[in-house]
Regions:
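Bacterial extracytoplasmic/cell-wall-associated proteins, especially those involved in peptidoglycan
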Residues: 1-163
């Protein structure tokens, strides 16, 4: 009858290997880690597969140009998981100054590790980013949908409207 914890873990690892690892078998080890880190941010940052692909494209552009990723979900991770703050879901401007390698506002590049356990959709979005003219995005406060912008001016207007 009962399935042991070891059997459950083996099934999960087999499933992971079948769905994900096969795509990495010829990749360098750092590529695997970087993909999982990026996917973990997408998993926490946006909701829909289409938005994940668009945000993946934006984050790839930021990585290529050395611009800070500025992923709010990393601040939530720092506050909730690393600092155990009770107000961890809301973000204040002062949070962008928290000294942590996971702070993608202070430190360019990817954080040192994943911030969540990404799903297959987020991992696929890292492999298949959607190219666009967008450079900025935010989540609307009321319904969580992602609002994209081409310029900082447009982004700041969207922040005033949607946040």
């Amino acid at each position: 009858g009962d399935v042991s914890i070891k059997e459950v873990v083996e099934m999960m690892l087999d499933n992971f290997e079948n769905k994900v690892y096969s795509r990495f078998k010829n990749a360098a080890p750092h590529d695997f880690n970087e993909t999982i880190i990026m996917a973990s941010m997408l998993e926490e940052e946006v909701r829909t597969p289409k938005d994940m692909k668009l945000v993946s494209g934006i984050l790839h552009k930021r990585l290529e140009t050395g611009v800070a990723l500025q992923v709010d979900a990393t601040l939530v991770y720092i506050k909730c998981s690393l600092l155990n703050r009770p107000d961890c879901r809301s973000i204040a401007n002062t949070d962008k100054e928290i000294k942590s390698l996971y702070n993608t506002y202070l430190y360019p590049g990817l954080p040192p590790g994943p911030i969540s356990n990404p799903g297959l959709t987020a991992i696929e979005a890292v492999f298949d980013p959607e190219k666009s003219h967008y450079l900025y995005y935010l989540s609307a406060r009321d319904d969580g949908r992602t609002i994209f912008s081409r310029t900082l001016e447009e982004h700041n207007l969207n922040r005033a409207v949607y946040r």
